[in-house]
Amino acid sequence: MIALVLASDPGQVGITRCLVRAALEYRGLGHYVPEAEIIASELVTNAIQHARSTDPSDKIGLTLMRGWDREAISVVVTDSSPLPPVRHETTTASEQGRGLQIVEALSAHWGWNHEQGGKAVYAILAK
């Protein structure tokens, strides 16, 4: 469906939301936009914060794919860190650490895989 390469920079999070919205609406999949925007921005934010290396040329990949059954889409974010994503337990006073909880709440399923040169974190949205 769509594949993008983003700089490992916090300014890319807002761009991510705009691109996800535009891509899904263009393809008539606007009903996925609210959840897909949030999931993509959370996964890109995690990649920027936790996979940041000393190499400013490091890139983050974002892919949106429609499922073979055409009833679901996948949001996939790749980064250069081989470390697994960690879902933190938070309290109402916590100011950070809710990203993967949000992804879990908004998706039908999420997970991650090792990729050459890093990992891919994905979330599947079904309507």
Regions found by a protein language model. Name each.
Residues 1-3, 48-127:
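Conserved beta-strand-loop-beta-strand hairpin that lines the nucleotide-binding pocket
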Residues 1-38:
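Bergerat-fold GHKL ATPase/HATPase_c domain
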Residues 31-55:
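Conserved ATP-binding N-box helix of the HATPase_c
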